[in-house]
Amino acid sequence: MVKIDLITGFLGSGKTTFIKKYAKYLLDKGMNIGILENDFGAVNVDMLLLQDLMGDNCELEMISGGCDKETHRRRFRTKLIAMGMCGYDRVIVEPSGIYDVDEFFDVLHDEPLDKWYEIGNVVTIVDAKLEPELSEEADYLLASEAANVGSIILSRAEEATKEQIENTIEHLNRALEQVQCKRRLDQEIMRKDGAELSEEDFDKILKGGYVAENYRKMDIDEKKGFDSLYFMELKISADELKTQVAKMMQDPECGGIFRVKGFVKDDAGSWMQLNATGHEISMKPIGDGQEVVIVIGEQLKEDCIRKYLEN
């Protein structure tokens, strides 16, 4: 049977960065792997960030979001059936930061997937400087992604104080309590950034497995709180984009922005990758890009955001 891992994490937590390192670790062990990118929206930016992993022993597949729940589940199942015929040793699923974890477990219990795949590890990436106050919906997503983990990685741990790290762990356990989950996390948490993980750490993650936990479910779709907005072919410089994103993330009139990501060309015509969260905004060179900026958050106000990006 093919081992299949689920790597989750709330928006901007650093899932893709971790997956690049985890995938390299698996490749160095001689494994043949497939990575399935599953984005919340209709445009998949993270796929571009993983292209340098592609080779004879690593293939990338994608499921686009932007559809209803049942359609997305059907696409996920169909893609896993196709990937089950490719001879992989291991498949890594990277869903959006807004994801119903039950979909992963439910689909893998369907025939014929239950005979082809064996769940390996469930890993969640959490920002070590997690915001102390999140909405009920956001806390639910956090809890649902943490409830079944074998390992939790605290991203940006090297930037956080000891107090911030402990507050984040308390927040995780508080979120679990709010959804009536009996589990409390401690030993499963690696208090170090993905960049600091050693081969021994990855050995431990590979053996981490998962835990089947019960918790009270919330239908996020009914809340209609999470949005993703797409802005294509913006006529804006890289420096100006970074400045405007910083401003709009501080403007409550734009809604609750969790993350902004995308690509833009600099003055020399080279691609730059934008990645913005509540803690930092970065603009880094990248080989290939796509003229798109994606804004993800709760109760977003498109007209207000558009003023920052287009004027």
Spans of features found by a protein language model:
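A short, charged/proline- and glycine-enriched loop
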Residues: M1-V2, G289-E291
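Nucleotide-state-sensitive switch-loop elements of NTP-binding domains
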Residues: V2-S13, T17-S135, Y140
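Short, hydrophobic beta-strand segments that form beta-sheet elements in well-ordered domains
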Residues: G34-L36, K261-V264, V295
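Short, conserved catalytic or adaptor-binding loops enriched in Gly and charged residues
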Residues: Q51-G55, E145, V179-R183
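A short alpha->loop->secondary-structure connector
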Residues: E111-Y117, L142-S144, I169-Q178
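Short, glycine-/small-residue-rich phosphate/pyrophosphate-handling segment
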Residues: Y140-L141, N148
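C-terminal accessory "lid"/substrate-recognition subdomains
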Residues: N148-L154, E159-G287, Q299-D303, E310
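Short, well-ordered beta-strand elements
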Residues: E291-G297
